[in-house]
């Protein structure tokens, strides 16, 4: 059904006393313009680049995603105070330029002389509680597209959440023909185009764009775990990965008439998220969650079960609740094994090819782990030396998150969708 509740959740502090962002990071985020709602800003923090490191301040593809979540989590607590005053207090050195939240600017001297707002961690806010958003549905949609995306990252201590739905009714109308227009394009390119479409105008609930986005997500995830491939497609479609296990996997929308999987009637869906920290370096997983955020901006997705999220994320209207859908986690490297096992059983991959891919996956994971842990150590050292200017460049993680997790069960749950 169409979305009626427009709540969003702010970031946790990861053990720090304040939002994990400082003036230097905030300035870097806003270097292209002072509005965090600009389409260019939104697509920028999705980060479509293939490189694992982009700059010292933005070392991974997931860094800008997390940092923008921190920036919005702090600055939006100014107008969402009970009195809704928007320009009398600053976050860091920033204030909103207008009550319509058009942009962020350096606070004037009188406000700079006053203490900054002390933002709170893990708060849920309702867009309709702020009068200027409640009165402008179109602007609220554009804002909520991004607030949905950061909520999908902030609900847990792991990676961003994606929604996967399989329903034959989604293929009605001209969706198949429109999907053919993306034949030969990468998942990243398709996601980029759909994000632009969502930002330009609200999607109708279960309209063509919303249905096509859900189909693209289902094709990606069914391909990601090896359920569909060139010998077992979903209505002739699947995503072909050119170098599975590589640091920069590219998934290309492909077609094959060899064999189509038998799809059961009905509507089946689940939520999935990477639990290992190397999601930070996987643009495809980030884009999948961003597309889910686009869906959330216009449609009310099923609730995520309270037992799948921490206490601070439970019973958020429109997001989590009792009796909701289970949130399935997986370890990125382990999912490569699930993918290879299925393709080998289906005769698409030889044992030698699997060994080669898994060896590449091991090398890639170790490289990513070394980088992420080095950056985390640098951030910890910086925060101890600068207690009044703390920050994290990537979302905090623990060593336990590198464990195998529930990957096999998650892979089976995705496979069971068809």
From Swiss-Prot:
<comment type="subunit">
    <text>Interacts with protein mu-NS; in viral inclusions.</text>
</comment>
<keyword id="KW-1153">Inner capsid protein</keyword>
<comment type="function">
    <text>Inner capsid (core) component.</text>
</comment>
<dbReference type="InterPro" id="IPR004317">
    <property type="entry name" value="Sigma_1_2_reovir"/>
</dbReference>
<dbReference type="GO" id="GO:0039625">
    <property type="term" value="C:viral inner capsid"/>
</dbReference>
<keyword id="KW-0167">Capsid protein</keyword>
<keyword id="KW-0946">Virion</keyword>
<protein>
    <recommendedName>
        <fullName>Inner capsid protein sigma-2</fullName>
    </recommendedName>
</protein>
<comment type="similarity">
    <text>Belongs to the orthoreovirus sigma-1 protein family.</text>
</comment>
<dbReference type="Pfam" id="PF03084">
    <property type="entry name" value="Sigma_1_2"/>
</dbReference>
């Amino acid at each position: 059904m169409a979305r009626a509740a427009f709540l969003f959740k702010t970031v946790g502090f990861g053990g720090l006393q304040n939002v994990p962002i400082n003036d230097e990071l905030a300035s870097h985020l806003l270097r292209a313009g002072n509005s965090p709602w600009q389409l260019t800003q939104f697509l920028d923090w999705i980060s479509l680049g293939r490189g694992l490191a982009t700059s010292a301040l933005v070392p991974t593809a997931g860094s800008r995603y997390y940092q923008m979540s921190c920036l919005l989590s702090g600055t939006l607590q100014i107008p969402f105070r009970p009195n809704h005053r928007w320009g009398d207090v600053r976050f860091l050195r920033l204030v909103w330029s207008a009550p319509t939240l058009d942009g962020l600017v350096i606070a004037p001297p009188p406000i700079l002389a006053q203490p900054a707002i002390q933002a709170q961690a893990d708060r849920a806010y309702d867009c309709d509680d702020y009068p200027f958003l409640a009165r402008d549905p179109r602007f609220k949609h554009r804002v909520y597209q991004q607030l949905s995306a950061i909520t999908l990252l902030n609900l847990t201590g792991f990676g961003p959440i994606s929604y996967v739905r399989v329903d034959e009714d989604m293929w009605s109308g001209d969706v198949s023909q429109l999907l053919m227009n993306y034949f030969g394009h990468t998942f990243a390119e398709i996601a980029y185009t759909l994000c632009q479409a969502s930002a330009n105008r609200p999607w109708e609930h279960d309209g063509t764009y919303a249905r096509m986005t859900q189909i693209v997500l289902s094709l990606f995830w069914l391909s990601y775990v090896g359920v569909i491939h060139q010998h077992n497609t979903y209505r002739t479609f699947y995503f072909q990965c050119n170098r599975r296990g590589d640091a920069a996997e590219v998934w290309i929308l492909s077609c094959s008439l060899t064999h189509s999987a038998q799809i059961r009637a009905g509507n089946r869906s689940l939520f999935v998220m990477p639990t290992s920290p190397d999601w930070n370096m996987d643009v495809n997983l980030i884009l999948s969650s961003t597309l889910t955020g686009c869906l959330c901006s216009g449609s009310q997705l099923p609730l995520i079960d309270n037992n799948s999220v921490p206490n601070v994320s439970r019973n958020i209207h429109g997001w989590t609740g009792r009796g909701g859908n289970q949130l399935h986690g997986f370890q990125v490297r382990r999912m490569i094994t699930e993918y290879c096992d299925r393709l080998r059983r289906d005769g698409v991959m030889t044992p030698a090819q699997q060994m080669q891919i898994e060896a590449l996956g091991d090398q890639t994971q170790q490289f990513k782990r070394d980088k992420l842990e080095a950056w985390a150590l640098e951030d910890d050292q910086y925060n101890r030396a600068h207690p009044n200017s703390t920050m994290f460049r990537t979302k905090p993680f623990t060593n336990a998150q590198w464990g195998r997790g529930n990957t096999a069960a998650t892979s089976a749950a995705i496979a069971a969708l068809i």
